[in-house]
Amino acid sequence: MTGTGRTVTRVDLCEAVYQKVGLSRTESSAFVELVLKEITDCLEKGETVKLSSFGSFLVRQKGQRIGRNPKTGTEVPISPRRVMVFKPSAILKQRINANGSAPSMSSSASAVDDDKSESASRT
């Protein structure tokens, strides 16, 4: 399940459980489906699902607002609705930034400190 820009599917998750846990493919599939169903059921009830070191799934209520039809420019009321939000944990953010192309906060902060010390030594 490694690679960039690739979409991981249920089948991929089931295969990972099969490979790493040692359950049969049928049991792995049932396990993944059970976990996803439990998360879905909790979110339907408006509960927050917090997975330590991963993040939280939560449902937020959005109020009614006025939008615009992009074709006509006419104002259109947008009904209130519930939306699902994912908030990644600090640990997940660090792991993503450590493996990604963007510099981490600590390395960019140290680069700023290095620049300050270099300019101070020149004066």
Curated annotation (Swiss-Prot):
Residues 97-123 are annotated as: Disordered. One of its GO terms (biological process) is regulation of translation. Keywords: DNA recombination, DNA-binding, Transcription, Transcription regulation, Translation regulation. Residues 98-111 have a biased composition (Low complexity). CDD domains: IHF_A. SUPFAM superfamilies: IHF-like DNA-binding proteins. Residues 113-123 have a biased composition (Basic and acidic residues). One of its GO terms (molecular function) is DNA binding. GO terms for cellular component: cytosol. Gene3D superfamilies: IHF-like DNA-binding proteins (4.10.520.10). Belongs to the bacterial histone-like protein family. This protein is one of the two subunits of integration host factor, a specific DNA-binding protein that functions in genetic recombination as well as in transcriptional and translational control. HAMAP family: IHF_alpha. This is Integration host factor subunit alpha. The lineage of its organism: Bacteria, Pseudomonadati, Pseudomonadota, Alphaproteobacteria, Hyphomicrobiales.
